[in-house]
Amino acid sequence: MKGMDEYEKIINDLNTINSKAKFIGIKIIMVRRIIDMHKDNDKLIKKVLEGIKNTDLYDLVLNACPELKGERIKDVYFKKNDYFNVIKKTMSSENTVLKNVLINDESPP
């Protein structure tokens, strides 16, 4: 691991957890622990998030640390297709509440 940048080591650790841990609860706890160790370093967290964008690992990190969905990632670059993919997944899901919000601009109950 010599010569590895700190963000690369974090991504490597996160990948190891994701591939080795059997249960989602364990994965979430372990991922949360790693992110919490670096929570005060916004630049590093953003670099990690950019490095894992569009992967299952990205979704796992955001599930483990929902606070990263807000202000911290506002500067992370999102491609236009990301938005369309989210909308497409929502529209093809069975979640009628989300569909109503998207189509009719209704607020959830």
Swiss-Prot record:
GO terms for molecular function: DNA-directed RNA polymerase activity. The keyword Transcription applies. Keywords: DNA-directed RNA polymerase, Nucleotidyltransferase, Transcription, Transferase. It catalyses: RNA(n) + a ribonucleoside 5'-triphosphate = RNA(n+1) + diphosphate. Its EC number is 2.7.7.6. GO terms for cellular component: DNA-directed RNA polymerase complex. It comes from the Archaea. It is an enzyme of class 2 (transferase). DNA-dependent RNA polymerase catalyzes the transcription of DNA into RNA using the four ribonucleoside triphosphates as substrates. This is DNA-directed RNA polymerase subunit I. It comes from Methanocaldococcus jannaschii (strain ATCC 43067 / DSM 2661 / JAL-1 / JCM 10045 / NBRC 100440) (Methanococcus jannaschii).
